[in-house]
């Protein structure tokens, strides 16, 4: 066959494929699909997938089908940047993600530089939005806000208890722990011990000895379920009856699986239970049909897709991320599965809300 003709045919085929692909609105999902926090990444993946299925069944966005492109950050900043570059290289303009603040901050820089809008369902670190990037939004609150909720509870109910504060050295965990520490200090409680653990470590006996010596009755842990579950177990194995507190990093079922009955009574902050909001009805039904629990991160990811949809519809553009960001900053309410959202100029929720939850016999219940 004539090579020139073959090249022409191949080029035409490429153009045809590109046109077909362009007819879809592609949303990238950057999340830890592998690694130590993959359980949270799975929640985000399922929430985004379900939202897209519901949206497409209703006609898509501006009549165009929505498709998802997944990129695994493994909970590691370097891999997150690599995943972001992959998304940028594919010409994608919208992203749901990231899960952890430590990955979200460097990735947001890459996305901002390349005109990609991101909505994170779970990255709560203040540094993410404090830099004033126009393209960054959340469907969750900030660390300081949830830490203050738990601190307020401690100040009202445990002011006579000896409180220790521990973190995992990460942006999320340390930020959460430091915000909690500052809040209880302001309220008149001085921690009896402040320390850290290293992610991946299994033996916390030296730390437990220090906590026991300090007489800690309450241990606030800023970090995720793996280290939190081990710490809870080892505290109780050492004969301590200390109550463990934390943030949404302790909300995954793997926390209970690791800590076992030693995790009984653990208190943690998380977004208000969206399942009690009438606006969540359709999302809950769609998730239930797929046997997916309506967990907080799942619902936040579902809402993140809805936020992108609302921005595209307001901006009237499926590929101008700057126009979409401007539309989301307009202060008008956005109806989502987790309720009505509005955004501040930093991309934070104007009225975030947190509740305190408790691990009770392997189940999460609201604190009465």
Curated annotation (Swiss-Prot):
UniProt keyword terms in alphabetical order: Amino-acid transport, Signal, Transport
CDD domains noted in UniProt: PBP1_ABC_LIVBP-like (cd06342)
Span of the signal peptide: 1-23
Pfam families recorded: Peripla_BP_6 (PF13458)
Source domain of life: Bacteria
InterPro entries in the record: Leu-bd, Leu_Ile_Val-bd, Peripla_BP_I
GO biological process: amino acid transport
Keyword Cytoplasm: no
Chain's role: Component of an amino-acid transport system.
PANTHER family: AMINO ACID BINDING PROTEIN (PTHR47151:SF2), LEU/ILE/VAL-BINDING ABC TRANSPORTER SUBUNIT (PTHR47151)
Family: Belongs to the leucine-binding protein family.
Protein name according to UniProt: Leu/Ile/Val-binding protein homolog 3
Organism field: Brucella melitensis biotype 1 (strain ATCC 23456 / CCUG 17765 / NCTC 10094 / 16M)
